[in-house]
Amino acid sequence: VSNMRLPMMMILLVLLALCAPLQAQTRPELDAAGNGLLVLSYHDVRDDVAAKGDPDAYAVSTQNFAAHLDWLSAHGYHPISLSQLVKASRGEAVLPSRPVLLTFDDGLRSVYSKVYPLLRAYNYPALVAVITDYVDMAPDRTIDYGYRPFGRDDFLTWDQLREMKDSGLIELASHTDNQHHGVQSNPQGNSTPAVITRAFDPATGRYETAAAYERRLRDDLSRSASLIEKNLGVRPQAIVWPYAAYNELSNAIAEQLGMPVSFDLEGRSTPVTRDLHGLARLLVTGNPNVTGLAFELRRNITLDGTRALQIDMDAVYDADPAQLARNLDTLIDRVKKIGPTHVYLQAFADPDGNNTADALYFPNRHLPMRADLFNRVAWQLKTRAGVKVYAWLPVLGYELPDPVQKQALGIASPEQDGMYRMDFTKPAARQIILDIYEDLAINSYFEGLLFHDDAYVRDTELTGLAQEGEDGNRTQALIDFTLALRDRAQRWRPKLGTVRNLYAQPVLEPQSAAWFAQRLDLFNAAYDHTALMAMPWMEGSSRPERWLDRLVAAVREHDPELKHTLFELQTVDWRTRTAIPGERLRAQVRRLQAQGVRHLAWYPDDFIADKPSTADARAAMSARNFPYPER
């Protein structure tokens, strides 16, 4: 949505027509907290780690680590080995109740001097992930390890690894040979994890080719596995990806080299199946004592609320690089001050405001690139503002530069509202859109997708599709296409979250759902969240607060606990082109929260003009104390 997009949205709402009421479905819970394997990720263990504020955020004190082992034992957790896990995945063994795998990253010397004696005392197995290039490094070599340079004496030796391996308690995983660092990922100079980045060469102005990227990964992983086998007599079965950054290609290469198990840092527990790639780990940070560890393990993350700002990249972009840089700094500063959980960041350019993509903000095969900007802005938001970034893209609305191709692949609609959409039932159109999502993932960092509000099909269009009916055939066809887009992007960005925009009218008047092929119950069953446009002024309501109350009541019919529905407020009355007062927005947020709404967003967020004001935005959209206070 934008100021320029108002006429289109109003026209779409006017065109809503009648159809039969539809029956709700229930979303299955896929991965309940605590129902699976718990994997804990440790790094350095030292005697002198500060209780709070240690320079190494990943270090744990020896005393606290010993207390963790005590607590796990006393509360029914059963440490397992990697070999037990692999056998269980093949159906050759049964894991004990509450299985936990202890992992130690980077191959630091403290694993031998502090951790190993405690593991022997408890008879607990563990997995140690070594960066083979750091083992037995040259005496004069140092590694930038964050808070100070680390040298030879900070990392394990092959002799120490051999002793621990021979004990039967310690198994070894690769942490790559030398990919535990960043490489330049865009023309602006940002550095992102080497394993997932096709490096940008400023000398040539080109990105690493697909073949060169694959060769770099294969050579590195082969060297790491071979060094472990040569020095320890056993080939590693697992790869622990640096920074939890990996993709389908890296996992495939690892498996071809004998490492069918891989770990990341996404999620809290993993059901044990035959596929052991991308196992979730809980990263232990901040030197937690037993209370802190128990807090994290018992916390129900499904109760965490979302606070999201939907951001126009068109407002960040400027043809003048200096002004663009100032715009980006303003955005980062504002988001950091507000403290939301997410930013939904526009990845397409829509300078004419007609709700479709004229160009894209990333390298791609099919549309012009307005600027190679999305990756930079997304990475800056993550690293400087500390938010999760979801890429906001159209589903169907791509205006191809070739007018003949554009016409041939568009939906032939009897409705003349000016909204161009590609016909996703045509193989050529599907392939182009799939390519766009894949190109985004190849070239950019993001953690999820926001599917734009252009994904609709009227009952007068695409007559070859089955009519909507009670089963929601057309709605499901569009959902299936969006999930195919997600799957294509997930080749390069695993475990993507999904959010999809939904107009309010199909929720308030279910008989109108068939006009757009959009249904809340089916959306909530398919996506992590549905971004419901809770925009009373856009809907022409004269009593906005009462309208919001009615919307919440209607949503509860499909989502009784409001787990999956995100209410997206409007900050501008596009009819009058005036901003909604900040106090009124804050009151609306309080009103929705009082009715049990957990997930909130708003649009637009005018970071250039500071509207809504940063103070109002912080009060309404900060997640710093939601739902749990800082410890």
What do the PLM-derived regions correspond to, one by one?
Residues G305-A315, V499-V507, V555-L585:
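Active-site clefts of carbohydrate-active enzymes
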Residues L95-S97, S110-R120, L331-I332, A349-P394, ...:
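Aromatic-lined substrate-binding rim segments of carbohydrate-active enzymes
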Residues L40-D48, D54, R98-V100, R120-A245, ...:
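Metal-dependent polysaccharide deacetylase catalytic core of the NodB/CE4 family, i.e.
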Residues L265, S269, T341, Y527-E545, ...:
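Substrate-binding cleft of secreted/luminal carbohydrate-active enzymes
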Residues T142-P149, L303-L324, A378-W379, K388-D439, ...:
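Active-site-adjacent "subsite" loops/lids of carbohydrate-active enzymes
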Residues P242, K388-Y398, L450-D454, R474-F516, ...:
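Aromatic-lined carbohydrate-recognition surfaces of secreted/lumenal glycan-active proteins
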Residues S61-I80, R326-D352, N443-G448, F523-H529, ...:
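Catalytic domains of carbohydrate-active enzymes, especially glycoside hydrolases
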Residues A245-R281, G497-P536, R577-T578:
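Substrate-binding cleft/loops of secretory-pathway carbohydrate-active enzymes
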